[in-house]
């Protein structure tokens, strides 16, 4: 994600958009952009659902899209006309030099969001208010000396679509939703959508870059790093979550091999073929701490004029010192939405921290990655939670009926199939998210 858009002014079509394309001709039929000039990593996390609904007696072939901000948009499939009202609402301007945040963003006005939309001071968890705060990608980071309340007061928290600033902006719901990659399930028999959601606050912070240095090559390379690499590998190259530490990368790479990885990518890392030779050489010099690299001053100045004035990066989740979210629960939910009427039917916590439940806390829900599956027997099956359970819910009431401890987190959407007259459900147990152990198994269940 790019959190500074001073060099890409405008709405930035067709990013963050749903496109209807004629599959035979490739012609665009209609489109809808959900976020203009995205500064918050609000890409669409999941595929849309093709649905048939009954709105005031009219049968409509529609398409529904869930979003990271926790909203559900529904359109007529043929022409892209919204089924329920959408309003372009005004949001604050950016305080960063050169940034021109788009003045409005579209929000549904009928279907309620599936995640809370603003983290206020009153929503700080009573149980953790006096504990130390932690801004970290995972639950095992280093706590600050400030309490959660003190840290909250230091940050900007004003709801959706507040542009990044140098103080730090709370993005809530966070960069992983709202809805996430598992997407939603839709029941054609009753017009109800079932979707899980996250309610985790994250912090987004801008840092002004200074390109005046006794070693302009290294300094310029540091600027390139902050713009393109720090959101994953950390501002100080120390790594985070599943992204490696780069501070000693010179033990394993030279300039040629490192530049090849930067350009072409490796594993989950995308490549950066857009970097020119000067940018690539400077970045390589910075990462390898090679102060001997020389670039002609004229060439460096010409390139540096294109450099962005800020590095805007994800600082991490806003947690307490024990790794629990700073906001009061629920931290993850499962939701049923009647898309015939645009109404939420029920909402229940999804997942739990067993150590908190044992102390008498109500189920808090957890962050979740992976979607639901509906059966014909009025059941919803879902893994997704960081407690590692696979669960079944009553689709009419949201009551949790059953759970099974998986060998690793089921951060995937289950599938179902039939063999020899018997129905099975399978979920991939890859784990690895949210600081949980990785796994390599598929687990299958028989529906008897």
Map each language-model feature to its residues:
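Repeat-solenoid scaffold signature
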Residues: 37-123, 176-181, 185, 274-282, ...
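Blade-level signature of beta-propeller repeat domains, shared across WD40, Kelch, NHL, RCC1
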Residues: 189-196, 200-207, 415-448
């Amino acid at each position: 994600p790019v959190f500074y858009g001073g060099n890409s002014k405008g709405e930035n079509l067709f990013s963050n958009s749903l496109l209807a394309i004629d599959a035979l001709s490739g012609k665009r039929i209609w489109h809808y952009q959900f976020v203009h000039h995205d500064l918050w990593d609000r890409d669409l996390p999941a595929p849309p659902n093709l649905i048939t609904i009954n709105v005031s007696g009219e049968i409509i072939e529609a398409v529904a899209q869930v979003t990271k901000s926790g909203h559900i948009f529904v359109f007529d499939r043929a022409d892209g006309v919204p089924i329920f009202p959408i309003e372009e609402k005004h949001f604050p301007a950016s305080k960063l030099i050169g940034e021109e945040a788009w003045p409005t963003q579209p929000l549904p006005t009928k279907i309620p969001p599936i995640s809370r939309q603003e983290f206020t001071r009153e929503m700080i968890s009573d149980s953790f208010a006096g504990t130390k705060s932690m801004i970290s990608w995972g639950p095992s980071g280093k706590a600050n000396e400030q309490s959660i309340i003190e840290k909250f007061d230091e940050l900007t928290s004003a709801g959706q679509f507040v542009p990044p600033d140098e103080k730090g902006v709370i993005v809530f719901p966070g960069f992983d939703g709202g809805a996430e990659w598992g997407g939603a399930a839709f029941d054609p028999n009753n017009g109800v959508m079932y979707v899980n959601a996250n309610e985790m606050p994250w912090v987004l912070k801008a840092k002004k870059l200074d390109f005046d240095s006794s070693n302009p090559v290294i300094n310029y390379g540091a600027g390139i790093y902050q713009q393109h690499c720090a959101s994953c590998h950390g501002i100080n190259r120390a790594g985070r979550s599943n992204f490696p530490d780069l501070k000693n990368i010179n033990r394993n790479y030279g300039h040629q091999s490192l530049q090849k990885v930067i350009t072409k990518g490796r594993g989950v890392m995308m490549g950066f073929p857009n970097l020119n030779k000067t940018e690539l050489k400077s970045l390589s010099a910075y990462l390898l701490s090679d102060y001997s690299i020389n670039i002609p001053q004229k060439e460096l100045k010409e390139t540096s004029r294109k450099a962005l004035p800020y590095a805007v990066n994800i600082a991490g989740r806003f947690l307490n010192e024990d790794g629990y979210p700073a906001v009061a629960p629920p931290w993850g939910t499962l939701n049923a939405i009647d898309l015939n009427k645009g109404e939420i039917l029920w909402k229940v916590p999804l997942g739990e921290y067993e150590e908190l439940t044992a102390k008498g806390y109500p189920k808090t829900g957890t962050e979740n990655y992976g979607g639901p599956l509906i059966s014909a027997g009025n059941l919803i099956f879902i893994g997704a939670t960081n407690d590692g359970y696979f669960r079944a819910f009553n689709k009419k009431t949201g009551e949790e009926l059953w759970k099974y401890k998986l060998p690793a987190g089921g951060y995937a959407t289950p599938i179902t199939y039939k063999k020899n007259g018997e129905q099975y459900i399978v979920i991939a147990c890859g784990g690895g998210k949210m600081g949980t152990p990785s796994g390599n198994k598929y687990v299958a269940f028989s529906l008897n």
